[in-house]
Amino acid sequence: MGQTLFDKVWNKHVLTGNEGEPQLLYIDLHLIHEVTSPQAFEGLRLQNRKLRRPDLTFATLDHNVPTIDIFNIKDEIANKQITTLQKNAKEFGVQLFDMGSVEQGIVHMVGPETGLTQPGKTIVCGDSHTATHGAFGAIAFGIGTSEVEHVFATQTLWQTKPKNLKIDVTGQLPKGVYAKDIILYLISQYGVDFGTGYAIEFTGETIRSLSMEARMTICNMAIEAGAKYGLMQPDEMTFAYVKDRKYARNFDRSINDWRQLYTDADAKFDKVIKLDVTNLEPQVTWGTNPEMGVSFNTPFPKIKNINDERAYQYMGLKPGQKAEDIDLGYVFLGSCTNARLSDLVEASRIVKGKQVHPKITAIVVPGSRSVKKEAEALGLDKIFKDAGFQWREPGCSMCLGMNPDQVPEGIHCASTSNRNFEGRQGKGARTHLVSPAMAAAAAIEGRFVDVRKVVV
């Protein structure tokens, strides 16, 4: 019987262990940041251990980084975490993309941009959205702090192999509908746990037609479907993206092997989901997890359980309302889901020559210094600033309430991030997940509108 893409990469990295039991995997790349690494480094010190493979360990600063004055960190905990990573990186010989570095940015942007993320690798990071790197045909997954320490010490992890789930996406995306809408729709239809226990391979003509940046958006949110892993078959678009990047020095030696990374025709999946996106609409979340979402023209659903009741109460909304009824106050363009150059380009087309609605606070946070530089070379910063957006420095920013960028209590925010949990963007913040185009249009109109009627 043939193998799936996931099986091929997994089996190549098994050092010991039987099928159906925990197996010891070799880890090719370990990405770290300031939040989940301090205790792991301290664990090495307490046991008088060295970092096993500093050459396979790369660090960046992202979660706590201010996006206005990056060298003036007022929060004591944030400042301590940042200075601790700087100290640890120096002590243990880890390459750190430090504050102000041309390569600094959100960890799941830095990996691909530098060429560290490559097909066929096993990649881990102490962050939930590590599956982003699966868009390159890698097995990439988030780990906890104790596992971070285990990788530090051994460059391995014990893992139990998951089942295989194929999501076959076909049809041409309508104008004004994007990769973000695909993954939001899937989660709204099948729930936040339909991928639990599975590695999801996204396949089909629609996936193959997407840019690498759009593919990363989909894999980024696999965890929101309950899946630890999300991946896609690497192809010529993947190889072109990786080629000539700083850490892709092995490109010529590796590309033939990368071309073998595909699911065999006779491979069997444990579950298959099919989605035709021909008539897909822009998506908007109304509640407090990504499953609580609707197509733009669909009324919010009836209350089915206590979770729905609590979500409506927290969000200040009612069944039967529509996205256009939401009283927005903030718009956030950023995060590891949608802060890449193509995201900012698409949003800039919508806001060019227009003005942010007077009641809206609109913020653009490029996901990395590289994206910021490229965007400014294209004049995107001027387009956004002329329209009334704030143009910030790179970082995780308003995706999570761990830095100064937070949504005020009770305020609704159109956000291009990946999570809309209670308090995710600040105490009492009300988050609505949308595509960059939807967020940009909302900033101008002061409310959600059907972006299909707005896109250039």
Swiss-Prot record:
Gene3D superfamilies: Aconitase, domain 3. Keywords: 4Fe-4S, Amino-acid biosynthesis, Branched-chain amino acid biosynthesis, Iron, Iron-sulfur, Leucine biosynthesis, Lyase, Metal-binding. InterPro entries: 3-IsopropMal_deHydase_lsu, Acnase/IPM_dHydase_lsu_aba_1/3, Acoase/IPM_deHydtase_lsu_aba, Aconitase_4Fe-4S_BS, Aconitase_4Fe-4S_dom, IPM_dehydratase_rel_enz, IPMI_cat. It catalyses: (2R,3S)-3-isopropylmalate = (2S)-2-isopropylmalate. Its EC number is 4.2.1.33. Pathway: Amino-acid biosynthesis; L-leucine biosynthesis; L-leucine from 3-methyl-2-oxobutanoate: step 2/4. It comes from the Bacteria. Its cofactor is [4Fe-4S] cluster. Binds 1 [4Fe-4S] cluster per subunit. GO terms for molecular function: 3-isopropylmalate dehydratase activity; 4 iron, 4 sulfur cluster binding; metal ion binding. [4Fe-4S] cluster binds at C336, C396, C399. Disulfide bonds: none annotated. PROSITE patterns: ACONITASE_1 (PS00450), ACONITASE_2 (PS01244). One of its GO terms (biological process) is L-leucine biosynthetic process. Belongs to the aconitase/IPM isomerase family. LeuC type 1 subfamily. Catalyzes the isomerization between 2-isopropylmalate and 3-isopropylmalate, via the formation of 2-isopropylmaleate. Heterodimer of LeuC and LeuD. This is 3-isopropylmalate dehydratase large subunit.
